[in-house]
């Protein structure tokens, strides 16, 4: 019986986290998406963070969050092992924000 309860709890946690991510993707609230991307990045969920940040970098351009979002996007790809894409975004970051 305990085994079934444990499996049910794990399944529930899995589907809840998937539901939250889908809710973020469908949202039109860009501040909410940005906060979610930062949260995913902080938790080491770089694929989720990069998916959200890809959408946000053009929207956030010219805002105070643009620099951090571009850096997190580059680091997300780097941490996923996608060094070519990471290099592209690091170069973009350097060209846009030469003083860091």
Q: What residue ranges belong to the model's regions?
A:
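C-terminal motif of bacterial Sec signal peptides marking the signal peptidase cleavage site
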Residues: 14-17
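Bacterial signal peptide processing site
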Residues: 19-22
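Short solvent-exposed coil/turn linkers within tandem alpha-helical repeat scaffolds
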Residues: 24-26, 58-66, 94-100
